């Protein structure tokens, strides 16, 4: 065993300086092991006393050298710990810097992506706006070039239904709203006999307005027993055109009763309705007060002047008709039956 230790000690001595200077920690450990080995050898030699020249125990110098080696080893360990701590702190700082750098890069990428997205949205909105502007301009141009539709619905009142068009259904004539006013009996108007404030002369009826028959003046004969002619009457023309549809009223004295012919071509001589109302027609004419002189001119009774004694309050207006409470839409074919009214 001693030989092995001595052989190891000898082998240690043969180490080169370059190998010894390779690592301080390794060198320190080798020194500690060598000093410890020498001390153990000295103690064994003292114990077994193989040689009387061997000093008892290990020497002080050897003990001091071993202590120095141990302190150096501890110093190296402290340095290693400090180095490791510094390295750990450095690694933490590097890691933190790397994390911050990564976060900064992510923020930069996010900002770049956000800017790119905003730019894309801006371009998209601009394109949509341009497209809408072009479409509006094209629509306006088409509207200006297209013809105007004059058949659009036109409401006629505030309460009209806008969904309905005025093109649906025909427009009623004026006579349909108020009945056939041209078929009314002239006897319904008071003061028309020429003595009152309302006479036929005020309508400027000439000599041709009242035909003659054998020199005897006649009024426009009413065809209906109730006072309504079959066609014609008072109406458009201010009560002067009694014969509706006739182009002119004949004034021949040799002609039979041809006044107020109907559209079917029947004359007064063969029309029982006209014949039956002849006397009443003459009486109406005489009551009106028209006279025919030798020259065929209509005159009024003596003492009466045209338009004399007229009272504006006696004129009939639409309000007077409305006061009668007449339903103008009753009857067949918009014909009004005045027999129900005591006029």
From Swiss-Prot:
Residue ranges, compositional bias (Basic and acidic residues): 107-132
Polar residues: compositionally biased ranges: 252-264
GO cellular component, one term: nucleus
Localization annotation: Nucleus
Region (Disordered), start-end ranges: 105-141, 252-277
InterPro entries: Mediator_Med2_fun (IPR021017)
Pfam families per UniProt: Med2
Alphabetical keyword list: Activator, Nucleus, Transcription, Transcription regulation
Function field: Component of the Mediator complex, a coactivator involved in the regulated transcription of nearly all RNA polymerase II-dependent genes. Mediator functions as a bridge to convey information from gene-specific regulatory proteins to the basal RNA polymerase II transcription machinery. Mediator is recruited to promoters by direct interactions with regulatory proteins and serves as a scaffold for the assembly of a functional preinitiation complex with RNA polymerase II and the general transcription factors.
Subunit annotation: Component of the Mediator complex.
Record-stated family: Belongs to the Mediator complex subunit 2 family.
Protein name: Mediator of RNA polymerase II transcription subunit 2
Taxonomic source organism: Eremothecium gossypii (strain ATCC 10895 / CBS 109.51 / FGSC 9923 / NRRL Y-1056) (Yeast)
């Amino acid at each position: 065993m001693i030989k092995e230790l001595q052989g190891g000690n000898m082998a240690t001595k043969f180490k080169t300086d370059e190998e010894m200077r390779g690592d301080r920690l390794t060198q320190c450990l080798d020194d500690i092991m060598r000093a410890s080995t020498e001390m153990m050898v000295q103690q064994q030699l003292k114990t077994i006393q193989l040689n009387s020249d061997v000093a008892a125990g290990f020497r002080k110098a050897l003990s001091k050298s071993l202590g120095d080696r141990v302190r150096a080893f501890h110093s190296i360990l402290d340095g290693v710990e400090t180095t490791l701590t510094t390295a750990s702190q450095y690694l933490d700082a590097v890691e933190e810097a790397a994390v911050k750098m990564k976060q900064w890069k992510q923020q930069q990428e996010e900002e770049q992506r956000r800017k790119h997205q905003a730019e894309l949205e801006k371009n998209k909105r601009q394109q949509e706006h341009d497209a809408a502007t072009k479409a509006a301009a094209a629509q306006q141009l088409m509207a200006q070039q297209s013809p105007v539709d004059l058949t659009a619905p036109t409401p006629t009142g505030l309460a009209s239904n806008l969904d309905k068009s005025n093109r649906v259904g025909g427009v009623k004539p004026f006579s349909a709203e108020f009945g056939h006013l041209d078929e009314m009996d002239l006897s319904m108007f008071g003061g028309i006999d020429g003595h009152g404030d309302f006479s036929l002369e005020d309508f400027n009826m000439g000599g041709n307005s009242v035909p003659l028959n054998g020199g005897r003046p006649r009024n426009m004969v009413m065809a209906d027993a109730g006072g309504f002619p079959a066609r014609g009457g008072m109406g458009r023309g201010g009560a002067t055109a009694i014969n509706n549809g006739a182009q002119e009223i004949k004034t021949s004295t040799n002609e039979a009763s041809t006044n107020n012919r109907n559209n079917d071509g029947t004359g007064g001589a063969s029309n029982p309705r006209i014949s039956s109302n002849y006397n009443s027609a003459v009486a109406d004419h005489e009551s009106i007060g028209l006279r025919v002189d030798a020259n065929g001119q209509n005159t009024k009774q003596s003492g009466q002047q045209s338009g004399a004694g007229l009272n504006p309050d006696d004129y009939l207006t639409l309000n007077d008709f409305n006061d009668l409470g007449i339903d103008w839409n009753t009857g067949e074919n918009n014909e009004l039956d005045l027999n129900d009214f005591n006029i």
